[in-house]
Each structure stands twice: as C-alpha cells, then as structure tokens.
Amino acid sequence: MEQGSGRLEDFPVNVFSVTPYTPSTADIQVSDDDKAGATLLFSGIFLGLVGITFTVMGWIKYQGVSHFEWTQLLGPVLLSVGVTFILIAVCKFKMLSCQLCKESEERVLDSEQTPGGPSFVFTGINQPITFHGATVVQYIPPPYGSPEPVGINTSYLQSVVSPCSLITSGGAAAAMSSPSQYYTIYPQDNSAFVVDEGCPSFADGGNHRPNPDADQLEETQLEEEACACFSPPPYEEIYSLPR
C-alpha cells in the first residue's frame, strides 16, 4: 500500500479550468464548397467579359472585315457560359447572398460550436485530457495508515484444522488453497464434523526426539484420519426429502 501511494505521489494529476474560446468567422477554415463557388464566380465573370469583348468586336467595329466573323459566334457563346457560371456560383454556393442571411447563418454556427461550459485539462499523466463542458469532481484518496495484517477468516481456519489439532505443512497448504464455500456453510457443530474423544494428542514434552520412521507413520495416520474426518456428509443427511 505504501508503494502504491508513493507511486501516486510521484505522478501528481493537476486539474485547471480553461475559459471557452469562441472561434470567429476569420478563424473558420474555408470549405471546399466555398472554394468551388469562388472559382466558378471569377471564371464566369472573366468569360462574360471576354464574350462581351468578342461580341463588340464582331458586330460593331469590324462589320466589313471577313477575318473577324468568328467573333460574332464566339462572343455570345463565351458570354452565355460566363453567365451560367455566375448563376451557379450565386444560386448553388450562395457566393453573393444578402448580408442578413450571412449574419443569421453565422449566429447559428456560433451557437453550435460554442461549448456548454468551461473546459478542464488534466496534466501530469502520459497524455493530457481535455473535457469540454463537463462536470469534473476531484477525488482525494484517504491517507494510508500503517500496514495492517490481512484479516483471516477464523471459521475457515477452524474448519481447516484437523480433529487432532495437528496438521502437516503439506496438508495446510492444500487446505488453504482450496475454496471455503463448503466449510463456511456447514460449521463444525454438524454431526458429521464431531470428532472422537479418543483421538491422541501430540504435545511437545521435554527434549525427547522420536524415531524418524515413527514420525512418518504418525504423519501418514494423521493425514488418513484428517481425510476421513473431512469427508462430506451424505445428501440425505443435509437435505431431508419431504414425504
């Protein structure tokens, strides 16, 4: 726990608020539709001027010259194409719309792009995180006290202990790794868990050391007795069937 709190202190998380920024119309990037509309508008104006020039050259100043007869046809064609481009730019892309329409559209765009609240930026981590218009609640963890030993279930330990109040290290490890569902549901007061009173007690008396072969035999007998004592009761004994 102390190591975890030390790591948290090494990487503090700073939270600060940022006032929302409302982008102006000059900051908004020009879209592709605006570019296409502007291109069509200027192209139409240029073609219209060229068409008017050719029309004037063909029909007014050079009436008696045969070399300028092609201008009488080319001028109106260019003029019609230029007018068509101008109409497309004005009607479809709204390049020459009225001032009131532009102001209303800008208000709608500003209302859609404006965030509902302030922005919060989290720093002190791998990548800063920004929340727009979100409610942020800072969590302060409680101070960690001295490390306490992990609590052990006493009922589970009682169920693990053998009837003779002695168990081997291998048996204890196997019993501790097994789940405690059955023994927590059915305590030792059950008749199936009642131990015999004639079970021998092994207490250390003096500095006497028994024979190693005798110790192995006693451990084997204790393991067999523990397995016999821990055998689950029959189903009929636990749940009596209604008649």
From Swiss-Prot:
One of its GO terms (biological process) is phosphate ion homeostasis. The chain crosses the membrane at residues 40-60, 73-93. Signal peptide: none annotated. GO terms for cellular component: apical plasma membrane; endoplasmic reticulum membrane. It is found in: Endoplasmic reticulum membrane; Apical cell membrane. It is a multi-pass membrane protein. It holds the Pfam family TMEM174. The keyword Transmembrane helix applies. Its main location: endoplasmic reticulum. InterPro entries: TMEM174. Keywords: Cell membrane, Endoplasmic reticulum, Membrane, Transmembrane, Transmembrane helix. The keyword Iron does not apply. PANTHER family: TRANSMEMBRANE PROTEIN 174. Interacts with SLC34A1; regulates SLC34A1 internalization by PTH and FGF23. Regulator of plasma phosphate homeostasis. Decreases serum inorganic phosphate (Pi) uptake by regulating the sodium-phosphate cotransporter SLC34A1 trafficking by PTH and FGF23 in the kidney. This is Transmembrane protein 174. It comes from Pongo abelii. The lineage of its organism: Eukaryota, Metazoa, Chordata, Craniata, Vertebrata.
